[in-house]
From Swiss-Prot:
Subunit structure, interactors included: Monomer and homodimer. Part of the essential Sec protein translocation apparatus which comprises SecA, SecYEG and auxiliary proteins SecDF-YajC and YidC.
Protein name (record): Protein translocase subunit SecA
Family the UniProt entry places it in: Belongs to the SecA family.
Gene Ontology CC: cell envelope Sec protein transport complex; cytosol; plasma membrane
Organism: Myxococcus xanthus (strain DK1622)
PANTHER family noted in UniProt: CHLOROPLAST PROTEIN-TRANSPORTING ATPASE (PTHR30612:SF0), SECA INNER MEMBRANE COMPONENT OF SEC PROTEIN SECRETION SYSTEM (PTHR30612)
SUPFAM superfamilies given in the database record: Helical scaffold and wing domains of SecA, P-loop containing nucleoside triphosphate hydrolases, Pre-protein crosslinking domain of SecA
InterPro entries, sorted: Helicase_ATP-bd (IPR014001), Helicase_C-like (IPR001650), P-loop_NTPase (IPR027417), SEC_C_motif (IPR004027), SecA (IPR000185), SecA_CS (IPR020937), SecA_DEAD (IPR011115), SecA_motor_DEAD (IPR014018)
Gene label: secA
EC number: 7.4.2.8
Length: 940
């Protein structure tokens, strides 16, 4: 009651923010007359002036009004589109690092130009992230014209680009690209051996288009770069032969709600006999148990033509949200191989993880993050908790008039599709365009077959090609058009009532003439004929488009009269947001339109999550075969089921993030160390962002790492190794209890030094004695061989980091797979994972230093030139290893299924790991341990 009263008195937070934004819009509008008076050539000089002001210390906020006003005028002149006031508001919210919820057709692409231009003035780059290559290319070309007019450079990161082309794209003021490309480039950069070869700059500001799709729907999809292992694939075939003989409910139990499957005692006994295994749960058979678990999941949980398709002898994953095929992606942990065995296609070797990051943690690394979508408000809590992002709802430019009708529910799926086909037939006769949304490729084909029987012409969009997908969706608003699509296919493309004249003209004309690539007999290229061809093509295109505009204008009026675009949903999705996205395709910019969902009791949501409440409602309402039920109670009950599923999925994503946060901290520490080593002597500024864990505020630092800094890093590593040795063999302060013989042997093996410890009275003297001897040897070699020796050590350090980090990733994979079983021992798996993961990481850091120092002290270059040759050899070897890594691939499912069977977990390490004095302090302060908690412990 109090909350309701306060909202009435002072308004909601969204209303208050809108009120503030309207005042700013008035200031932008005041500058419009001045901007209209500018000559075309003045725009670049205005951009240069604002850039200089930022260099002189003026803030981006101070320049917002000018930047927005000049961008609006540039867009008006170049592409004939002037930003509406609501788009200015959206741009302001994006600049503040919020998510702007803007309904479909309100011009998100144009809105993004405002904060993009403003933030690009800083010179640190802006990334505009889209859901596919087609949209990235389209928006970069379309909006790039505006940016170029303003004197800004624009790049586009596409899958087919090489490293040099990627560098150029990232060096641009504004870079467009697909989310996977940005994430994989980050991982690949952190596997390189020269800072100059990095393609990405600092992660300054990102605007994520369709932010809900990327940060929520794909949050369970980690990006993984991997290399093949040598494991045999025979076990997959062997296990696959026995799984089909298992009987449901008798040999295994299936839980569709939690997507888990588990063997019964009968099933275990049956499999042990058929596989010739004494006890599947014997530690020696843990690998076989893992294969059984994955094969069982492959046969029971993963369905052909729903979760994947078989194409050209390969299993290709189908995106559960868009219905798009995702070639190149593979399920992890042997699941993909189990499905390949099930389908009888060639089984590819499993891959070992070389580098991995989740979308959640990649995008949280940006100094500032913002997003746009038509549907975010239902997930506002998740955006706030995980990404620290506020959702701001932007009002529409014109009042929406779409009519959303009550759901209708049938008893069987067949009755439902009959009703859908009958409804489409009626709408089609009236000339009203219809967009039918389905949840899978298989369901699209079912709807198509019902329409075919009735002789209704239609287009089926199975999302195989983004360009064709966009063209078909663009024409879905034509008179009488019927388009069947998975729920989100063609997202990012406006559906214009009456059709899109430009797309129609391009379809009838074909592509423009290709430029000549060579001239005969080595003569210089003569482009006169080509330019004439292009001019003729452009003229013909303009004429064709003009004729088609007349046609589409007439059609638009007819479609308006018929009621606009009508959306038919054939099933409720697990998320209300995805349903809202489908509905949002109709009624853009104040157009008429309507929507209705047709459901059945056999739909997955109703069957798995509907609960007894919906079934009870049906019985009370007296549902008979062939009868349809339409009631507000039913719609509320279905929405309640969706809310429960959304909560369940949010918990899964949150759980995944909590596990991934452990790896994220380790990854950032290793990559930071790696960059410090790489930066030594490179002359390239090292830019880093440190985040306060409480406020999440990021601070930027920039420095150059010299060879002197690298020498200090080496000496710090020596110091830590010495402390570790003395902790092991001389644990007491006094000489009592020291194992002198073992210590001498340890110093000999590690430092290649024969040492006598007579006269050393305590542990501090002992450490100093060893350190001075090792430092003397190191400095002598450094003075003799100079920079070549440093470069040799640099590549050795990198090789050691990469080798042990790869082993650590494998160990963490094994730990993660088995950690769920700790719950049976009354231990919290998450806390156990954090504890053991941290112990393993500290041990890995110690091993990196120990192995590097051992190599350093045992190597003896013959000359400076031999040190240089050895450094070059190691660099070539490392580069070759990197090339062998599989081109970035993404696993399709990163969540822990509740019924997954564990692989062998790594044994627990010591209860309290030895933290190196020069390691980052475990408290998270970012300072070295010896200068933080290590200092207080030393004084005790």
């Amino acid at each position: 009651m109090i909350e309701w009263t306060l909202k009435k008195l002072i308004g909601t937070k969204n209303e208050r923010e809108l009120k503030k934004a309207h005042a700013k819009v008035a200031r932008v509008n005041e500058l419009e007359t001045r901007m209209r008076a500018l000559k075309d050539e003045d725009f670049v000089s205005e951009t240069n002036r604002m850039r200089q002001e930022i260099q002189n210390g003026r803030s981006l906020d101070d320049l917002l009004f000018e930047a927005f006003a000049i961008t609006r005028e540039a867009a008006r002149r170049v592409i004939g589109q002037r930003h509406y006031d609501v788009q200015l508001i959206g741009g302001m919210f994006l600049h503040e690092g919020c998510i702007a919820e803007m309904r479909t057709g309100e011009g998100k692409t144009l809105t993004a130009t405002l904060p993009t231009y403003l933030n690009a003035l800083s010179g640190r780059g802006v990334h505009v992230v889209t859901v596919n290559d087609y949209l990235a290319r389209r928006d970069a070309e379309w909006m790039g014209r505006v940016y170029r007019f303003l004197g800004m450079t624009t790049g586009c990161v596409l899958h087919e680009l090489n490293d040099k082309q990627r560098q150029e794209a990232y060096r641009s003021d504004i870079t467009y690209g697909q989310n996977n490309e940005f994430g994989f480039d980050y991982l690949r950069d952190n596997m390189k051996f020269r800072l100059q070869d990095y393609v990405q700059r600092e992660l300054n500001f990102a605007i994520v288009d369709e932010v809900d799709s990327i940060l929520i729907d794909e949050a369970r999809t980690p990006l993984i770069i991997s290399g093949p292992t040598e494991d045999s694939t025979d076990k997959y075939y062997r296990v696959d032969q026995v799984i089909p003989g298992l009987v449901p409910d008798q040999d295994y139990t299936l839980d569709e709600k939690h997507r888990s499957v588990s063997l019964t005692d009968d099933g275990i006994e049956k499999l042990q006999k058929r596989l010739g295994v004494g006890n599947l749960y014997d530690p020696g058979e843990i690998e076989m148990l893992h294969h059984v678990d994955q094969a069982l999941r492959a046969h029971t949980l993963y369905k052909r033509d729903k979760d994947y398709v078989v194409k050209d002898g390969e299993v290709v994953i189908v995106d559960e949200f868009t219905g798009r095929q995702m070639p190149g992606r593979r399920w992890s942990d042997g699941l993909h191989q189990a499905i390949e065995a099930k389908e009888g296609v060639k089984i590819e070797n499993e891959n070992q993880t070389l580098a991995t990051v989740s979308f959640q943690n990649y995008f949280r690394m940006y100094s500032k993050l913002a997003g746009m979508t038509g549907t975010a408000d239902t997930e506002a809590e998740e955006f706030a908790k995980i990404y620290n992002l506020d959702v701001r709802v932007i009002p529409t430019n014109r009042p929406p008039i779409r009519k959303d009708l009550q759901d209708v529910v049938y008893k069987t799926e067949r009755e439902k599709f009959e009703a859908v086909a009958a409804e489409i037939e009626e709408l089609h006769k009236n000339g009203q365009p219809v967009l039918v949304g389905t949840v899978s490729i298989a369901k699209s084909e079912v709807v198509a077959s019902f329409l075919k029987k009735r002789g209704i012409p239609h287009n089926v969009l199975n999302a195989k090609q983004h360009q064709r997908e966009a063209d078909i969706v663009a024409q879905a608003g034509r008179k009488g058009a019927v388009t069947i699509s998975t729920n989100m296919a063609g997202r990012g493309t406006d559906i214009l009532l009456g059709g899109n004249a430009e797309v129609l003209a391009k379809a009838s004309m074909g592509p423009p003439p290709e430029p000549p690539t060579s001239a005969p007999d080595g003569q210089p290229l003569d482009l006169t004929a080509y330019e004439a061809e292009v001019a003729a093509w452009e003229q013909k295109f303009a004429d064709t488009k003009a004729k088609l505009e007349e046609q589409t204008k007439k059609e638009r009026e007819e479609v308006h009269t018929a009621g606009g675009l009508f959306i038919i949903g054939t099933e409720r999705h697990e998320s209300r947001r995805v349903d809202n996205q489908l509905r949002g395709r109709a009624g853009r910019q104040g157009d008429p339109g309507g929507s209705r969902f047709f459901l059945s009791l056999e739909d997955d949501l109703m069957r798995i999550f509907g609960s007894e409440r919906i079934q009870g409602l049906m019985e009370r309402l007296g549902m008979e075969e062939g009868e349809v039920i339409e009631h507000v109670w039913l719609s509320r009950a279905i929405e309640g089921a969706q809310k429960r599923v959304e909560g369940h999925n949010f918990d899964i994503r949150k759980n995944l993030l909590e596990y991934d946060d452990v790896m994220n901290q380790q990854r950032r520490t290793i990559y930071k160390l790696r960059r410090q080593v790489l930066a030594a002597g490179a002359g390239v500024p090292l830019v880093e962002y440190d985040e306060d864990p409480k406020t999440r505020i990021k601070t930027r630092s920039e420095r150059t790492v010299s060879w002197a800094d690298f020498r200090e890093l080496i000496l710090d590593s020596m110091e830590d190794v010495i402390v570790s040795l003395t902790d092991t063999y001389a644990p007491t302060r006094g000489v009592e209890g020291w194992d002198i013989a073992a210590l001498q042997q340890g110093v000999k093996e590690t430092f290649n030094l024969e040492m006598n410890f007579e006269g050393v009275g305590n542990r501090e003297e002992l450490q100093e004695h060893i350190y001075k001897a090792a430092e003397k040897v190191f400095q002598a070699r450094d003075e003799e061989f100079g920079e070549n020796f440093m470069r040799f050590l640099q590549y050795n350090y990198l090789a050691t980091i990469d080798r042990l980090w790869k082993d650590h990733l494998l160990a963490m994979d094994h730990l993660r797979q088995g950690i769920g079983l700790r719950g049976y021992g009354q231990k919290d798996p998450k806390q156990e994972y954090k504890k053991e993961g941290y112990q393993g990481f500290i041990q890995m850091l110690s091993a990196i230093k120990a192995q590097f120092v051992t190599q350093l002290m045992h190597v003896q270059p013959r000359s400076a030139s031999s040190a240089a040759e050895e450094a070059a050899r190691i660099q070539r070897q490392l580069a070759q290893q990197q090339k062998k890594a599989v081109e970035g691939r993404a696993t399709a499912d990163g969540k822990l299924d509740e019924g997954s069977v564990a692989a062998a977990a790594r044994p627990a390490a010591a209860s309290r790991p030895a933290v190196g004095r020069n390691d980052p302090c475990p408290c998270g302060s970012g300072r070295k341990y010896k200068k933080c908690h290590g200092a207080s412990e030393a004084s005790v």
